[in-house]
């Protein structure tokens, strides 16, 4: 299909913990497409989404959902059954990438360096630490750092963790515990078959959690990151390799920790996000700008890939 004009249904919102982020992403995408002359149907995801899509009859669906069910293969399967073309990754890739443990199983055998970890259930935390402190607890299938905590010796969760501790992970049953990797937080966006740039995330206080990601002023984005050329290239190579191994489509974003005292050996891939944010503060649009691509062009590029 040509560059349009297209009729694009933008799926956003939903009921995951990342609903508000998705609404911001969806609004940005829809506004950008309309500014380029495309017809847009905005759909706040609900249980009647299939009926609403059937009525709209779009040329393509822009999936701006984050979390379950828009990022775990559920929506992708529905769109496949309905015969709609859609942006970003397909069913199988989404099922694997949303699950941090499955992602490790898919990538580590191919030489992608990732932290060792162990699966735990939240109840077991009250009797024994799963790893030596400090360690990171994260839900297996949430994004945007929802439910993530760093458990340190001096944390207020208790030792062992107390049932009265108000840890952000408590609403989740399946957790992944990983060693805490000291150092710097970096991320690489991949668009199509190109790694765009490396961004360093410098948090004013604490760590790069949900609030730090989506509250203006809490995190400084340094793009391109001030890191050695070989480190930047290694991260871009790993992000592109992970994108290809998982079968990602459209845009993805790979998050890294880098222990800068150990050079290339200190680079660890944390996760691959197949539905990266498209808010004004989001990293993929920022990296696109760094390589000369404005927001509306980025959105059109993602839609074009879905239509080819």
Swiss-Prot record:
Stored PROSITE patterns: ATP_GRASP, DALA_DALA_LIGASE_1, DALA_DALA_LIGASE_2
Nucleotide-binding is among the record's keywords: yes
Cofactor binding, per record: Binds 2 magnesium or manganese ions per subunit.
Substrates-to-products reaction catalysed: 2 D-alanine + ATP = D-alanyl-D-alanine + ADP + phosphate + H(+)
Entry GO MF terms: ATP binding; D-alanine-D-alanine ligase activity; metal ion binding
Residue ranges of domain ATP-grasp in the record: 104-304
Cofactor(s) needed for function: Mg(2+); Mn(2+)
Localization (cell): Cytoplasm
Listed pathway(s): Cell wall biogenesis; peptidoglycan biosynthesis
GO biological process terms on file: cell wall organization; peptidoglycan biosynthetic process; regulation of cell shape
Chain residues that bind Mg(2+) 1: 255, 271
Binding site for Mg(2+) 2: 271, 273
Keywords, comma-separated and alphabetical: ATP-binding, Cell shape, Cell wall biogenesis/degradation, Cytoplasm, Ligase, Magnesium, Manganese, Metal-binding, Nucleotide-binding, Peptidoglycan synthesis
Record EC number: 6.3.2.4
UniProt GO cellular component terms: cytoplasm
Pfam families documented for this protein: Dala_Dala_lig_C, Dala_Dala_lig_N
UniProt cross-references to Gene3D superfamilies, sorted A to Z: 3.40.50.20, ATP-grasp fold, A domain, ATP-grasp fold, B domain
Binding residues for ATP: 131-187
Family membership noted in the UniProt record: Belongs to the D-alanine--D-alanine ligase family.
NCBIfam families associated with the record: D_ala_D_alaTIGR, PRK01372.1
Cited function: Cell wall formation.
PANTHER family xref list: D-ALANINE--D-ALANINE LIGASE, D-ALANINE--D-ALANINE LIGASE B
Name under which the protein is recorded: D-alanine--D-alanine ligase
Gene name of the record: ddl
């Amino acid at each position: 299909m040509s560059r349009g004009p297209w009729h694009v249904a933008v799926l956003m919102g939903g009921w995951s913990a990342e609903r508000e982020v998705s609404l911001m992403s969806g609004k940005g995408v829809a506004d950008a497409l309309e500014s380029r002359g495309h017809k847009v149907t905005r759909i706040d995801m609900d249980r009647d989404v299939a009926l609403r899509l059937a009525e709209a009859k779009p040329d393509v669906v822009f999936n701006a959902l984050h979390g379950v069910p828009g990022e775990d293969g559920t929506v992708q399967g529905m769109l496949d059954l309905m015969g709609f073309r859609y942006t970003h990754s397909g069913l199988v890739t989404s099922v694997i990438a949303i699950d941090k443990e499955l992602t490790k199983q898919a990538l580590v055998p191919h030489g992608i360096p990732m932290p060792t970890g162990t699966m735990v259930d939240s109840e077991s935390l009250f009797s024994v630490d799963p790893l030596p402190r400090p360690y990171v607890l994260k839900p297996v299938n949430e994004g945007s750092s929802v439910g993530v905590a760093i458990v340190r010796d001096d944390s207020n969760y208790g030792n062992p963790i107390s049932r009265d501790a108000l840890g952000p992970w408590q609403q989740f049953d399946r957790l992944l515990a990983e060693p805490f990797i000291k150092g710097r937080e970096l991320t690489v966006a991949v668009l199509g078959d190109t790694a765009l740039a490396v961004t360093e995330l410098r948090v004013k206080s604490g760590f790069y959690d949900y609030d730090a990601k989506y509250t203006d002023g809490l995190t400084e984005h340094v793009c391109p990151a001030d890191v050695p050329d070989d480190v930047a290239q290694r991260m871009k190579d790993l992000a592109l390799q992970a994108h290809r191994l998982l079968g990602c489509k459209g845009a993805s974003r790979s998050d890294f920790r880098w222990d800068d005292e150990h050079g290339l050996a200190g680079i660890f891939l944390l996760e691959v996000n197949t539905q990266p944010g498209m808010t004004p503060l989001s990293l993929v649009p920022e990296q696109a700008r760094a390589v000369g691509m404005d927001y509306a062009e980025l959105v059109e590029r993602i839609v074009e890939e879905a239509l080819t």
